[in-house]
Amino acid sequence: MGFFGFGKKEKDKMKTGLEKTRTSFWGSIMNTLTGSVIDDDMYDELEEKLILADVGGDVAVHLVDKLRDRVQEKGLKTGEQAADALRDIIAEEMTPEAEMDLSGKPAVILVIGVNGVGKTTSIAKLADYYTRQGKRVMLAAGDTFRAAASEQLEIWADRAGVPIVKAGEGADPAAVIFDTVKSATARGYDMVIADTAGRLHNKSNLMAELSKISRSVKKAAPEASLETLLVLDAITGQNAISQAREFCKAADATGIILTKLDGTAKGGCVVAVKQRLGLPVRFIGVGEGIDDLLPFTPEGFVEELLPREWKH
């Protein structure tokens, strides 16, 4: 693997998926930086453009303040140097404190999120990604509240070439996931990826349901590790982050999957997620194909968003 952990195929997918974002709002940001002297006008214009790119007002101010400090500390003189500094700052802001914990036997990933954000397809894409990494993956159809959710996931499981455990509509999700983890453990599978309900009536219901699922995982396999990934739709941007805040608190999420990045010209919500939600982005969706979910690397993302070889 080359480019920050990516091979050429992944780098090309990232480049293509972020084209709309790179050539619009973020291209304008590059023009501001590389076409200006470093002064208050440049900082003001940069802040405005970061807000337009859907970074959010508070995060835009934070980034510009950090850039001012970095420019002063390092004695930077040119717009190109300021652009380099901004790249570094954004990558630092998005860097997770730790890698995902997939050390368990099996490693269990719960996937949560409201309906319509691409949760089911993200599960299949995760299964495909980890299968290509040499893992044996089993899916759990834990969204038993929505008609056809299990059938939809079964179709995607077939495409990904992985087995799935499911039950009838209205079955207990914790029981379905318990059975899946038990089966995966008995059959020597490395990983279970579990769907969960996309809509529960209130926060306490959600907390109770996910707490019950967590207990069922540990009961089924005491050696299991557990990650909970929240799926957000990048097209809805800052609205997605606002809606997710309460969801995160209730669900005890450990990371984010950001879908549909290829469908937005803004993309700034990726930069804002970690600071606003306190959670790292783990994967990004850059297309509709089953292999269009990429592991998120801050440096690789920033290099595509704010390319060093920039032509006005």
Where on the chain are the PLM-derived regions?
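Short beta-alpha junctions and helix-cap segments that line functional grooves
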Residues: 3-5, 98, 126, 242-244, ...
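Short hydrophobic/aromatic patches at helix-to-coil boundaries
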Residues: 195, 311-312
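Short glycine-rich anion-binding loops that position phosphate/pyrophosphate groups of nucleotides
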Residues: 197-199
